[in-house]
Regions:
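Hydrophobic positions within alpha-helical transmembrane segments of bacterial inner-membrane proteins
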Residues: 109-120, 149, 153-161
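Predominantly long cytosolic amphipathic alpha-helical stalk/bundle segments
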Residues: 9-110, 122-134, 161-197
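Hydrophobic alpha-helical membrane-embedded segments
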Residues: 1-6
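Hydrophobic alpha-helical transmembrane segments and adjacent short intramembrane/lumenal linkers
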Residues: 131-145
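Hydrophobic aliphatic residue packing
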Residues: 117-120, 138, 142, 155, ...
Length: 197
């Protein structure tokens, strides 16, 4: 449930931030107002790219604000690498705890099957103890077998549906992160007056 809320918040906040990013031609003013945005994947990617660009700018001999000199291709590659690392970190954070759900999807049917086999063995044991194949001898084992099968399915089916829905949301946000990283680097490389207030 918490993963669903996390992804819903991330998706909504991502769309809001993306709209602001596209409307705002000035990174510095966007960074000044970053506090109004939730701490979501795109905001974290932006912060990483922005801070890397500022480091490169401060290390450069050129004054970007006064003579509108853009980044060199090697500087852009450094920014792109920082943004790509941030995208990977955010993807890992989004996928956190999904392994637990995947394990439930995979393991529950097998636990149900184990219970079924155990119940059938119990039914045969009941037949052997009573010396007959009467319903009263096999019913407890069969009912136990069916119960564990039902429990396994009750766990597996909702887990599978939840896993698939959450995975779909994660893929959607991951695509947005990849697209944003390209858009961010492209915007920096195409706008020489990007840093002016």
């Amino acid at each position: 449930w918490t993963k669903s809320v996390q992804l819903k918040t991330a998706s909504t906040s991502t769309n809001i931030f993306l709209t602001d990013f596209r409307k705002n031609k000035n990174l510095a003013s966007l960074m000044k107002n970053i506090g109004k945005h939730h701490n979501t994947p795109l905001v974290n990617i932006f912060k990483s790219g922005y801070s890397t660009a500022l480091e490169i700018k401060s290390e450069s001999n050129s004054d970007f604000e006064s003579n509108n000199i853009g980044f060199t291709s090697s500087q852009l590659e450094s920014i792109r690498a920082a943004v790509d690392c941030s995208v990977a970190d955010q993807a890992l954070e989004l996928e956190d705890q999904m392994g637990l759900l995947a394990t439930a999807v995979s393991a529950a049917p097998f636990l149900g099957l184990l219970g079924t086999v155990w119940g059938v063995m119990d039914a045969f044991s009941g037949m052997a103890d009573s010396g007959s194949a009467a319903l009263s001898a096999v019913a407890p084992g069969i009912s136990g077998a069916l119960l564990t099968t039902i429990i396994g399915l009750i766990v597996a089916l909702p887990s599978m549906i939840g896993y698939n829905l959450l995975s779909s949301k994660i893929r959607h946000i991951a695509v947005q992160m990849d697209n944003f990283s390209q858009e961010f680097v492209s915007k920096i490389s195409n706008e020489n007056n990007f840093w002016e207030d």
